[in-house]
Every structure is written in C-alpha cells, then in structure tokens.
UniProtKB/Swiss-Prot annotation:
Modification Cysteine methyl ester occurs at: C586
PROSITE patterns: G_GB1_RHD3 (PS51715)
Designated name of the protein: Guanylate-binding protein 1
Gene: Gbp1
Subunit and partners: Homodimer; homodimerization occurs upon GTP-binding and is required for the second hydrolysis step from GDP to GMP. Undergoes conformational changes and oligomerization upon GTP-binding and hydrolysis. Heterodimer with other family members, including GBP2, GBP3, GBP4 and GBP5. Dimerization regulates subcellular location to membranous structures. Interacts with SQSTM1. Interacts (when phosphorylated) with 14-3-3 protein sigma (SFN); leading to GBP1 retention in the cytosol and inactivation.
Sites of Phosphothreonine modification: T587
Lipid-attached positions, S-farnesyl cysteine: C586
Coarse class of the protein's main subcellular location: membrane
Pfam family, any one: GBP
Cited CDD domains: GBP, GBP_C
Modified residues (Phosphoserine): S156
Keyword Nucleotidyltransferase annotated: no
Chain ranges of the GB1/RHD3-type G domain: 35-276
Annotated membrane topology: Lipid-anchor
Organism: Mus musculus
Length: 589
C-alpha cells in the first residue's frame, strides 16, 4: 500500500453532520499510507448538477461517487477516492467530491462556505461545476469566491494586508476549472467563433462604473481573476434525454450524445495531463501524510471557530515532519555506525572519522526530509542528539576495550597468580624471578592486537591491584640489600608517575580531539544548512516571480480593457510584492 493505493470505492473524508465537520479516521489512515506525491482534484457546485459523474470518469469507473437520480443531494461532506494516476507514474490521483451547495434540505450557507473553502485549500485543481451558461445568476451563485478572504488567512500575523493575502493566495491556490453542463449556446462573440476558454474570459470582463450594481457585477469576476490567474473552461452538451439522465452511469457511451462523450474525454485528458502535484509555499510537494495533516489542521481550525490559516497549516506540518526527520536521521546514524564500526577500535580517531562520515550523511537525511525549520530548532536538536550518540559510542568503545583487556589480562596472568599462591616466589631471588615473569607476560599482552583504547589503562590498573603482592615479595626477598630494595621502590614510583602522566596526557588529547570533532560537526551543520537555505531562497524567489508574472498578465488584461484604476491598483500590488523582504539568511546555530 506504500507505493500505490487501490481503493475500490470512494470513502467519506470529512463528514458534514448536524452542521459539524468531522474527519473520518479511516480515510486519514489511507492518506498516511500514500508516500507518492498527490494530484488533488476537487469539484464543487450546486446540488444535482452532475459533479459525481465527472469524478467517476476521472477515476476510470462507471460508478463510485453517488450520482443519485432525484432532486435530493446525495453527497454529504467531502468524499475521497485515491487511485493510481493513469498517466503519471509515481503519482497518486486524489479525487474529492463535495456535497452540493445551496441544498434546500440543508439550509446552512455557512457550511457551504466551509466546504467551498476546504476544496480550494486542499486541491491542486479546483473544478466549479454549474448548469447552463455563465450569466449573472451563475456569478451570483459563485458568491463563495468573494468570501474567500473572510474564510481563509494566508498568514498568521494579525496585521496582514489584502495585498499580502492576494499574493499568498495566488501562490497557494489551485488551477480553476469551470465546467458548464447542458450548455446549449453557440460559442460566438461579435459574430466570430470562440473557444470555451475565451468564453470564460469574456464572461469575466468587468463593467465600468462605480455604482452599487456595477460593483456587485464586478466583485465575483474580480475575485476569480485575482485569486485564480490560471483558468480553464469546458462546456458539455446534454448527455441524453431525461430517462437517460436518471441512469447515466449504466448507459453505454455509444448510446449517449456523441458531442457529450467527446467533451468528457477532452476534459479528463486535460485533467490527467495538466493537473499538477499539490504543492505548498516554497515548492513543498504534498504526499498522503502531508495532505492528511492539512485536512486535520484546517478542519480543527474551523471547528474551533477560527479561520483556517495556510501558514499555520504549513508550520504545523513542518513541526510534525521535522520531528520525524530528526528521528529518521538519528536512526540512520545508529544503523550506519553499528554496521561499520568494529569495536573496540585501536584509536579514538578511527571512531571519530567514522562518526564524521555517518554524521554528515545523517544531516543529509535530515535536510532531505525537513522544511521550514524556524530558527533551526530541529537542526539544533539533531546536533545535540548526534553528539550524545557519538559520546555513547565512545563510551561503549571504551567499555568494550576495558572488558576485553580485563579478560585478556586474567587469561595471561592466571598461571603467574597460581604460582604466587603456591609460594613459588617466596624465596631468595624470588622478587626478580616474579618481575621477569611479569615483564614477559606484559610483553605478550602488549603484542596482542585488538585491545582497543583502554589497553594501557587496564594494564596499569591490573598492576596497581597487584602492588601489595609485589611490595611483599620485594620486602621478603632476602637476597636483596635494603639499599637495593630502596632503589627498586624508587624505580616503581617513577614508573607509576610516568604512567600517570601518560594517562593525563592521553585524557587531554582525547578532550582536544572531541572538541576538534565538535567544531567539525558545527561546520558540517552550517555548510549543509547554508546550502539548504540557499536552495529554499531560490525556490521562494521563483515562486514570487511566478506570482508576479501571473499578476502582470492580469494587469495587462485590465489595461487593455480600459480599467485604469484596477490596473494601477494591481501594479501597486505587484510593486509591493517585489519589495517584500527576501527570505532571511542563515543564522548561527
């Protein structure tokens, strides 16, 4: 299920019961399993306008989304159908069918507004389905588009301006597709044939004037032009007679109106070819889990009496994914270290070199799976955890070395200790005989490979544990004069002091190596962070340029149509977008 989802039928994603929006947890589980990028196509429109038929066609099925055959609206809430994309391998097509707007049985305009807003927020292609032509009645029925700024926030800051809203809406909002059912007019304008797209643009033309009627006429048209600069229109003839309409999903295509069948084929082909993957600000690609998070965040805001905020949704998603990215990076680091390290290592440098390689790759894993890490909070957490893991490996390495050396010493010196117990060395000349045997075994110990970092430390500790025995043998050896015993004791003290100094120097060296490695770690974090932020900056600048380009096209249209004031207003918006501060540069961790 991880790569492809095979839903045999649609499932309710957001239930609309008793004027409350409730998320279906089973639908969320399905979204969680979709690791592929998702192309989200949502359709809205008045009830009983045939939305579900088009969505079934996109799913490649005759039935699925409920069509119904009466004046009652069948679809309640938002229904979801996830299918493999028929034309783009590696992508999943998520179809969202919504309940009919302005259902007389429901009588709740506010819920219609939220359904409309959610469809816009969740989709990469937004289809508005209506019956007949684009006249003033059709525009009045599309009043929801004029309320989008009252239903959706693009930024979380309370002082956000309409210009900021408009710019961010263009960056977030989907392609707008208007499907006109049972269309019976000839597509002509001023006596010349026009395309459905040209018909849409003609219908969105503004009227000059400042009276209330003109403002009312222009408002929905301005909103569509402003928020949806990428627009498409499809017209559909009536599919058949009234009897056929009541059982449309069961009728063979060759029994339907030929023009209607061709128009549906053209529509589905466009959606499959040109509907893009759902993305968020900064070019963030949405997959199943990310879509799930958006659904939860938006519905939670609505149910709490707040406006769904696009920025907050992205930041919430970033919190979830960045936390998971830290864990993914740490898991990768541990797996690589455990696979490649052979403990105990002979030197600390050997372990630190491996740590540095695995750490660099772990940071790459984090960078690949994270985004919008505000103030590098999660990268700092990753750095702290990697340092702790490094220290744990250093300790484990030393512990394993200590245990191995302890076992080796016990094995090598076992016979010598047995001889001591038997009194072999309690005789004249016994001390130097003991010392000779001890030095032979010490040499064997030193020559034995694979002891690790604690080799000298453990040898010193072992000898320290036997100091009383050596001291006793020295004092009891009657072949030695007091002067010779004194000289030997001084030698032993000097050796002990030298060993202590070596141990101290080794500790200092270890500390310096760890500090140097910490600096290298910091530099690696900064290097990858700088590269990622530069890439994100380029993506944001490209997105800003795309928004400006779309607005410039709209400004040019307004200018050509003689709307100087509206064109000037849009020009001012464009200049404000251009003067927006660039994404902030990298900060020190």
């Amino acid at each position: 299920m991880a790569s492809e989802i095979h839903m045999s039928e649609p499932m309710c994603l957001i239930e609309n019961t008793e004027a409350q929006l409730v998320i279906n947890q089973e639908a969320l589980r399905i979204l969680s399993a979709i690791t592929q990028p998702v192309v989200v196509v949502a359709i809205v429109g008045l009830y009983r306008t045939g939305k579900s038929y088009l969505m079934n066609k996109l799913a490649g099925k005759r039935t699925g989304f409920s069509l119904g055959s009466t004046v009652q609206s069948h679809t309640k809430g938002i229904w979801m159908w996830c299918v493999p994309h028929p034309k783009k391998a590696g992508q999943t097509l998520v179809l969202l069918d919504t309940e009919g707007l302005e259902d007389v049985e429901k009588g709740d305009n506010q819920n219609d507004c939220w359904i409309f807003a959610l469809a816009v927020l969740l989709s990469s292609t937004f289809i508005y389905n209506s019956i007949g032509t684009i006249n003033q009645q059709a525009m009045d029925q599309l009043h929801y588009v004029t309320e989008l700024t009252d239903l959706i926030k693009s930024k979380s800051s309370p002082d956000q301006s309409d210009v900021d809203n408009s710019a961010n809406f263009v960056g977030f909002f989907p392609i707008f597709v208007w499907t006109l059912r049972d269309f019976s007019l000839d597509l002509e304008f001023d006596g010349e044939s026009i395309t459905p797209d040209e018909y849409l643009e003609t219908s969105l033309a503004l009227r000059k004037g400042t009276d209330e009627n003109t403002k009312k006429f222009n408002m929905p048209r301005l909103c569509i032009r402003k928020f949806f600069p990428k627009r498409k229109c499809f017209i559909f003839d009536r599919p058949g007679d009234r009897k056929q309409l009541s059982k449309l999903e069961w009728i063979q295509e060759d029994q339907l109106n030929k023009e209607f069948v061709e128009q549906v084929a053209e529509f589905t082909s466009y959606i499959f070819s040109y509907s893009g993957v759902k993305t968020l600000s900064g070019g963030i690609t949405v997959n199943g889990p990310r879509l799930k998070s958006l659904v939860q965040t938006y519905v939670s805001a609505i149910c709490s009496g707040e406006l769904p905020c696009m920025e907050n949704a992205v930041l919430t998603l970033a919190q979830i994914e960045n936390s998971a990215a830290v864990q993914k990076a740490i898991t990768y680091y541990e797996e690589q270290m455990n696979q490649k390290i052979h403990m105990p290592t002979e030197t600390l440098q050997e372990l630190l070199d491996l740590h540095r390689t695995c750490e660099r790759e772990a940071i790459e894993v984090f960078m690949k799976n994270s985004f919008k890490d505000v103030d590098q909070k999660f990268q700092e957490e990753l750095g702290a955890q990697l340092e702790a893991k490094r220290d744990a490996f250093v300790k484990k390495n030393m512990d394993m070395s200590s245990a191995h050396c302890s076992d080796l010493l016990e094995g090598l010196f076992a016979h010598l200790e047995e001889e001591v117990k038997q009194g072999t060395f309690y005789k004249p000349g016994g001390y130097y005989l003991f010392l000779q045997r001890k030095q032979e075994l010490e040499k064997k110990y030193i020559q034995t490979p694979g002891k690790g970092l604690q080799a000298e430390v453990m040898l010193r500790k072992y000898f320290e544990s036997k100091e009383d025995l050596a001291d006793t043998l020295l004092k009891m050896d009657q072949s030695l004069t007091e002067k010779e015993k004194q000289i030997e004791m001084e030698r032993i003290k000097a050796e002990a002091a030298e060993a202590a100094n070596r141990a101290l120097a080794e500790m200092q060296k270890k500390h310096e190596m760890l500090m140097e490695q910490k600096e290298q770690s910091y530099q690696e974090h900064m290097k990858q962070l700088t590269e990622k932020m530069e890439q994100e900056r380029k993506e944001l600048m490209a997105e800003q340029q795309r928004i400006i380009s779309l607005k410039l096209q709209e400004q040019e249209r307004l200018l050509k149509q003689g709307f100087q004031n509206e064109s000037l207003q849009l020009r001012q918006e464009i200049e404000k977008i251009k003067n927006m501060p660039p994404p902030r540069s990298c900060t020190i961790l």
